[in-house]
Swiss-Prot record:
Belongs to the eIF-6 family. Monomer. Associates with the 60S ribosomal subunit. GO terms for molecular function: ribosomal large subunit binding; translation initiation factor activity. Binds to the 60S ribosomal subunit and prevents its association with the 40S ribosomal subunit to form the 80S initiation complex in the cytoplasm. May also be involved in ribosome biogenesis. PANTHER family: TRANSLATION INITIATION FACTOR 6. Gene3D superfamilies: L-arginine/glycine Amidinotransferase, Chain A (3.75.10.10). It comes from the Eukaryota. Keywords: Cytoplasm, Initiation factor, Nucleus, Protein biosynthesis, Ribosome biogenesis. GO terms for cellular component: cytoplasm; nucleolus. This is Eukaryotic translation initiation factor 6. It is found in: Cytoplasm; Nucleus, Nucleolus. Its main location: cytoplasm. It comes from Trypanosoma cruzi (strain CL Brener). CDD domains: IF6 (cd00527).
Length: 248
């Protein structure tokens, strides 16, 4: 299931939310409609938690996480940290980290097994990510950009990357993540996928400007539709055909 929504006047859904298989964070102090879209779809399965980070509403840019944990930057207050620990499942470890590159959501993209990280993250932060999220970490870039969290989105079934990512790089990313990878856009051609889309293994939320074709690609690569079938090569070919049709 893929749902379109908007935070106030912004289609950057991924800037104002963080979605995993164990919890969903939604920025505090915004539109009730934005929160309600997440709550109606997710509340029967995982907690949907209002929060800020360091008083900021751009929680998607500042955090990274999966079903094992949540990592927040040093600007997160003690009160915010305690609120998160009280609100999230006991199985989710919440960890604050001292890191110069504190927009962790822009610098890290991960599923429940692997994290791709900014090449300049500190070794201490990398170790905390491994421990808190229980993942393997790989330093890499996407389309020659180190902000991997801005230009890729991943769940345990697939990955979408910046539309100008070379095929060789996509093959390497697929090998690291052990999931199929496709290049695509969100919000009617926007290459900053991480800003406009959040996914877990059964749901996705994107901006209102996202086209039907873009949603089709999202639902196929992340395997959100129950009528999907066939093997991985067929899936990737269908995705390429869809993208070619969109560009034609």
């Amino acid at each position: 299931m893929t749902l379109r929504t908007r935070f106030e006047s912004s289609d950057d859904v991924g800037v104002f939310s963080r979605l995993t298989n164990a919890y969903c964070l939604v920025t505090a102090g915004g539109s009730q409609n934005f929160y309600s879209v997440f709550e109606q779809e997710l509340a029967n399965h995982i907690p949907v938690v209002y929060t800020s980070i360091g008083g900021s509403r751009v929680i998607g840019r500042l955090t990274c996480g999966n079903r094992h944990g949540l990592v927040v930057p040093s600007i997160a207050t003690d009160q915010e940290l305690q609120h998160l620990r009280n609100s999230l499942p006991d199985s989710v470890k919440v960890q604050r980290v001292e890191e110069r590159l504190n927009a962790l959501g822009n610098c890290v993209v991960c599923n429940d097994h692997v994290a791709l990280i900014h090449t300049d993250l500190s070794r201490e932060t990398e170790e905390i990510l491994r421990d808190t999220l229980q993942v393997q970490t790989f330093r890499t870039s996407i389309a020659e950009n180190a902000l991997v969290g801005s230009y890729a989105v991943v769940n345990n079934k697939g990955c979408m990357v910046h539309p100008k990512t070379p095929a060789q790089d996509m093959d390497e990313i697929a090998s690291l993540l052990q999931v199929p990878v496709v290049a695509g856009t969100i919000n009617r051609g926007n290459a900053a996928i991480g800003s406009g889309l959040v996914v877990n293994d059964w749901a996705a939320f994107c901006g209102l400007n996202t086209t039907a074709t873009e949603i089709t690609v999202v639902e196929r690569i992340f395997q959100l539709r129950r009528d999907l079938g066939g093997d991985e090569p067929n899936l990737l070919q269908q995705l390429r055909d869809t993208l070619v049709d969109e560009l034609a």
